[in-house]
Amino acid sequence: MAHRVEQDYDYLFKIVLIGDSGVGKTNILSRFTRNEFCLESKSTIGVEFATRTLQVEGKTVKAQIWDTAGQERYRAITSAYYRGAVGALLVYDITKRQTFDNVLRWLRELRDHADSNIVIMMAGNKADLNHLRSVAEEDGQTLAETEGLSFLETSALEATNVEKAFQTVLAEIYHIISKKALAAQEAAAANSAIPGQGTTINVEDTSGAGKRGCCST
């Protein structure tokens, strides 16, 4: 979802949060969108999303961040959840090795359902619990490099690198969108220079933003 619309923002980017249940996706969402953290937050039931508007290279971007439970029983919503996403944060818990071991499965699912150009940031969350660490930062960095992903360790509790993670993803999405728009303009200019040619290339979806849907406890 990368809409260019005549509203109070220039672009609307849909970003999905994925990863096992309990890794801190909901607190990452609330930290980025509301600057809040809840120590007793429960697992998300179904799907919820929140938005935040910010500046990316002089453009006003509305980030629509989607969060869903990681349990297998919610896999039925996979296709709808990923549809239209242009960015993703793949989150694991640095204190739980199994959540890191499951990263490749989540990555495979993401690549199966999302656009091939989706921008992915892998986030090793709960970096504030370094004394309980079971996944070395180097392991996360190595896996990210192997898979061609960006990587940061984050702490929703201490607000460490949460802002940077989203800003990095949003900036990369914007660069991709800008390159596509420029290529389309160049192609249109080339076509207009050919007698008898008048091709219009539309690379922007101007449909309205999706309706808000939220169900959480």
Swiss-Prot record:
<dbReference type="InterPro" id="IPR027417">
    <property type="entry name" value="P-loop_NTPase"/>
</dbReference>
<dbReference type="Pfam" id="PF00071">
    <property type="entry name" value="Ras"/>
</dbReference>
<keyword id="KW-0967">Endosome</keyword>
<dbReference type="GO" id="GO:0005525">
    <property type="term" value="F:GTP binding"/>
</dbReference>
<dbReference type="GO" id="GO:0005768">
    <property type="term" value="C:endosome"/>
</dbReference>
<keyword id="KW-0813">Transport</keyword>
<keyword id="KW-0653">Protein transport</keyword>
<protein>
    <recommendedName>
        <fullName>Ras-related protein RABA2d</fullName>
    </recommendedName>
</protein>
<keyword id="KW-0472">Membrane</keyword>
<comment type="function">
    <text>Intracellular vesicle trafficking and protein transport.</text>
</comment>
<dbReference type="InterPro" id="IPR050209">
    <property type="entry name" value="Rab_GTPases_membrane_traffic"/>
</dbReference>
<keyword id="KW-0342">GTP-binding</keyword>
<feature type="lipid moiety-binding region" description="S-geranylgeranyl cysteine">
    <location>
        <position position="214"/>
    </location>
</feature>
<dbReference type="GO" id="GO:0003924">
    <property type="term" value="F:GTPase activity"/>
</dbReference>
<feature type="short sequence motif" description="Effector region">
    <location>
        <begin position="41"/>
        <end position="49"/>
    </location>
</feature>
<dbReference type="GO" id="GO:0009504">
    <property type="term" value="C:cell plate"/>
</dbReference>
<feature type="binding site">
    <location>
        <begin position="155"/>
        <end position="156"/>
    </location>
    <ligand>
        <name>GTP</name>
    </ligand>
</feature>
<feature type="binding site">
    <location>
        <begin position="19"/>
        <end position="26"/>
    </location>
    <ligand>
        <name>GTP</name>
    </ligand>
</feature>
<feature type="lipid moiety-binding region" description="S-geranylgeranyl cysteine">
    <location>
        <position position="215"/>
    </location>
</feature>
<dbReference type="GO" id="GO:0005794">
    <property type="term" value="C:Golgi apparatus"/>
</dbReference>
<dbReference type="GO" id="GO:0010008">
    <property type="term" value="C:endosome membrane"/>
</dbReference>
<feature type="binding site">
    <location>
        <begin position="67"/>
        <end position="71"/>
    </location>
    <ligand>
        <name>GTP</name>
    </ligand>
</feature>
<dbReference type="InterPro" id="IPR005225">
    <property type="entry name" value="Small_GTP-bd"/>
</dbReference>
<dbReference type="InterPro" id="IPR001806">
    <property type="entry name" value="Small_GTPase"/>
</dbReference>
<feature type="binding site">
    <location>
        <begin position="125"/>
        <end position="128"/>
    </location>
    <ligand>
        <name>GTP</name>
    </ligand>
</feature>
<dbReference type="GO" id="GO:0015031">
    <property type="term" value="P:protein transport"/>
</dbReference>
<dbReference type="GO" id="GO:0009536">
    <property type="term" value="C:plastid"/>
</dbReference>
<keyword id="KW-0547">Nucleotide-binding</keyword>
<dbReference type="GO" id="GO:0042546">
    <property type="term" value="P:cell wall biogenesis"/>
</dbReference>
<keyword id="KW-0333">Golgi apparatus</keyword>
<keyword id="KW-0636">Prenylation</keyword>
<comment type="similarity">
    <text>Belongs to the small GTPase superfamily. Rab family.</text>
</comment>
<feature type="region of interest" description="Disordered">
    <location>
        <begin position="196"/>
        <end position="217"/>
    </location>
</feature>
<keyword id="KW-0449">Lipoprotein</keyword>
